[in-house]
A protein has these predicted regions:
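Short, basic/aromatic beta-hairpin or loop at an interaction surface
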Residues: 66-78
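Conserved hydrophobic positions within beta-strands
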Residues: 38-42
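Short aromatic-glycine-enriched beta-strand elements
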Residues: 48-58
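Short boundary/loop segments of OB/S1/cold-shock single-stranded nucleic-acid-binding domains
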Residues: 22-36, 91
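OB-fold/S1-family single-stranded nucleic acid-binding modules
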Residues: 103-129
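Bacterial N-terminal signal peptides
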Residues: 7-20
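Short nucleic-acid-contacting surface segments enriched for D/E, G, S/T with interspersed K/R
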Residues: 80-99
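Positively charged n-region of N-terminal signal peptides that target proteins for export
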Residues: 1-6
Length: 135
């Protein structure tokens, strides 16, 4: 009987703590051996942790509009590279054309893991993991 309360406490704590871990995922969906550069107009963006996100409309080789879904690093990493929420929200509100460099999805669908972004005013930011200072 003495072990029931501690055991239940451990089980309940584990259940509560595992949920945030399940929300985060690996980058295995992205092909880190390749990079793709895509230009298009921002349709939507989200500035949040654990990842920021950009949806952008880009033209394919036939002139068709394709929605690209871009996942980026967390907001702390972005801010550390000089890229901030106001920049992203202003670009989204103004429906600016941006250029992104991404590791593409392995599935071939239009999307990728953000490595760099160039805004309409020409400002560029390298935000991918290979640009992060490990110190």
């Amino acid at each position: 009987m003495k072990l029931i309360k501690p055991t239940l406490s451990i089980i309940l704590s584990s259940i509560l703590l595992i949920n945030p871990l399940l929300a985060h995922h690996s980058a295995i969906a992205f092909d880190k051996s390749k990079t793709v550069t895509v230009s298009g107009v921002i349709a939507r963006s989200v500035w949040r942790n654990p990842h920021m996100a950009i949806n952008m409309n880009a033209e394919d080789d036939d002139g068709n509009q394709i929605l690209w879904k871009i996942e980026g690093p967390g907001t702390t990493i972005l801010s550390g590279q000089g890229f901030n929420k106001k920049m992203l929200m202003d670009a989204t509100k103004n429906k600016e054309e941006i250029t992104v460099v991404v590791h593409p999805l392995r599935s071939g669908k239009p999307g990728g893991l953000l490595q760099g972004i160039t805004l309409a005013n020409g400002d560029s930011y390298q935000v991918g993991e290979e640009y992060q200072d490990p110190s």
